[in-house]
Amino acid sequence: MKKPCRSNFPFAILLIFAISSCSEVKKTVVLSSPDKSFAYSLKTSNDDSDLLYSINFKGVEIVAPSVLGFEFSEKLEVEKVVIGEIVTKSENSSWKPVYGEKKEYLEVYNEVLVDFSGLKYTLRIRAYNEGIAFRYEFKNEAGQINITSEKTEFNLPAEASAWVSSRAQSAITKMKVSEIKEAKERPMLIQYSDALFVAIGEAGLVDFAMMKLINNNPGTGVLTASLEGEVTYDRAFNSPWRFVMAASEPGKILESNYLLLNLNEPNKIEDTSWIKPGKVIREVTLTTIGGMACVDFAARHNLQFVEFDAGWYGNEHDDASDATTITVDPKRSPGPLELKRVINYAKEKGIGVVLYVNHRALEKQIDEVLPLLQSWGVAGIKYGFVNVGPQEWTDWLHEAVRKAADHKLMIDTHDEYRPTGYSRTYPNFMTQEGIRGDEESATNDMVINTIFTRMIAGAGDQTNCYFAERVAEKMGSHTSQMAKAICVYSPWQFVYWYDRPVGSPVKKGRAGGSVPVISEIPDLGFYDALPTVWDDTKVLDGYPGELAVIVRKSGDSWFLGAITGTKEHALSVPLDFLDSGVKYKATIYSHDQSLDTYTKVKIEEIEVTNQSVLEQSILKQNGLAVRFSKI
């Protein structure tokens, strides 16, 4: 790591001077990525009233001159902005996460910290090989600051196509940038041409208001950062990062999504031995018998956790419900539920228990609930229906993650929250929803949209179901469910979401009444063997709505997931990602409608090497899963 240096610009940082009509010297700062693929230019506007930036990728301007800055409740800026002192830094290192999509992440960038006369903040800009990021850093002497809105623009081609959603869990649709009329979620994927894709988003959001993207002048290509409320500080502070990534294929952007982790602080949990990724089964009956059955099933099938969802402490939406008591909601289950008995039984079997707690209880009782659940031996909590958007709730949620870490509790957050990389700093933050998952019965084309947009942000809990009728009726096939479990990354992977194991009680019209029983069929071998975190990840092919082909490595094994959308595909996948000189057994899970089985999953085994090519035809709205094991 290089230390910051003053007035000694690395090769990738260029300072351009221009003489104005008033014989004043104006600066333009140009910062390039280490591989020179990205270049960020910063200058003042013609009348010196605004800061402007632009971004080039491989010689193509992907963000035309765009305004930077904020609006404040009180005027803090002067009429003239001048670029002042510049501090430079370069980084060339890597780091190993507690868990991830890769076992090691590169962190290579050039950086400038630019000061200004006339402004209360500096601008920190980083040029990575994966993209550009910048944030605003407000100084100690700024006093109390109230930000009413953000002015940061992204000036894009008006005719470029973007995949957008209004909410974190709503449908993702494709439209021209010029047609965007309301605030849209981040990250946003934009296609400029057949060989140029751009992603815009936010990283390092901890105690600021969340950003969305809005086109305030429909018909143009100018998107503006739209804050979900005002922001107030009475101390020095930094804004979240705004990032722009680009690549020739959407899969290359997805492969580089660790950029968001790089833009967060390193791990602050000294002892991480208690942080455990794994597969989770939900206990759907809220009964002792059902809990025991789930524990036995988890132990038998290499699952790591059992989760009790809403209802174990009463009606989750009733403020009178007390999350320090075990009081089953009678509308969800007749019980009985001896929860502590199940937790102790699970511990004997090496299985962790996760409990759901709605935000209503957390906001009132979090300082009581966390130590209590720790004393019960609970492994983690699923925070339910958390508030997102305004600064108040952003700050509350991340403080709630930190408080959970103090009690050695892992966290899964539902419903609208999307990650911005905080799991690097607090890796007990295992996963989150903020995704159009199986609860929404998303079709495969929508899932593929999700993979290439939402998953840029990081892990997504999409509640993978398997035996539920909706799989065949609405969601494609059972093999596409398998493929999703590979393609949609989540360190806590919830499987068999709407299902229950043999031994769970059936109560007509109540808990367990219409929930399918998990049959002990060969398909389960796939989920038994499935890891949830990885040593390496490669996106081999894909395009939103049409196709996703992703391979992931864990130890000596590789897993391939392929999902089709609106069209069928004849896959031809070179297996050159496998180790050379080694034979592998490929266990292939494919859809075969002719089979007289409920899931229509055909399982076959073949021998392959890294010289082999996998040839498979996949129907539209379908999928394929393959496990490669060394022989």
Predicted stretch roles:
Residues K474-S554:
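Glycine-rich, aromatic-lined ligand/substrate-binding cores of catalytic
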Residues Y543-S580, L624-A625:
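Carbohydrate-binding surface patches
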Residues S20-S21:
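C-terminal motif of bacterial Sec signal peptides marking the signal peptidase cleavage site
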Residues K2-F11:
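Bacterial N-terminal signal peptides that target proteins for export
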Residues G311-S477, Q481-M482:
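Aromatic- and carboxylate-enriched substrate-binding clefts and catalytic-loop regions
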Residues F237-F305, D309:
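An acidic-aromatic substrate-binding cleft motif
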Residues E605-I631:
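C-terminal beta-strand-rich structural cap/linker in extracellular carbohydrate-active enzymes
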Residues K26-N264, T597:
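N-terminal accessory beta-strand-rich subdomains and adjacent acidic, glycine-rich linkers
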